[in-house]
């Protein structure tokens, strides 16, 4: 994981699984290699193995459950996604919230397994406290902006700048900005405000030409870090 970080969360859209997901992943892989910018794909658990076999990009889980090995029907464990080929996982996404003690447990297990961790928080006040648990990155997403097309970098730039101030108190942890990021200009502003990368979902997954959206994000990110 290195800046500029771009993570695309596939969620559970029509094109999030099966051949459609693989084809999208291959298109993103091609653009990623063209610009030498690594893109992380966070996919449904049922797609981790196939995506990791057919797409040459880091595949992350969208969520893992904070339960041990044992009698937990339907649970998706860190050990399972690791075995399926995942390189990391999202933790505590706004659509899959965990308690603080559960986050601590999951982070300990992902570290032990060698999985990268992207911990999601919904406000900047949580950045420093959760940075003490040493995730690889913290993704800040005001939930009211998720999926709206109104980006955090435009609507609430102070959320990013304050989160940047908080992340600087801990060494070696990246800050990723998410929620409503739709255009290349949103990406550019987020990185210029101090974020190390961006997290997106619907802007790519619901786009008519997702590869063009991804290319716009990459070129905007590169422009931000080089200017």
UniProtKB/Swiss-Prot annotation:
Coiled coil: none annotated. It is an enzyme of class 5 (isomerase). Pathway: Carbohydrate biosynthesis; gluconeogenesis; Carbohydrate degradation; glycolysis; D-glyceraldehyde 3-phosphate from glycerone phosphate: step 1/1. GO terms for cellular component: cytosol. InterPro entries: Aldolase_TIM (IPR013785), TIM_sf (IPR035990), Triosephosphate_isomerase (IPR000652), Triosephosphate_isomerase_arc (IPR022891). Its main location: cytoplasm. Its EC number is 5.3.1.1. Involved in the gluconeogenesis. Catalyzes stereospecifically the conversion of dihydroxyacetone phosphate (DHAP) to D-glyceraldehyde-3-phosphate (G3P). This is Triosephosphate isomerase. It comes from Saccharolobus solfataricus (strain ATCC 35092 / DSM 1617 / JCM 11322 / P2).
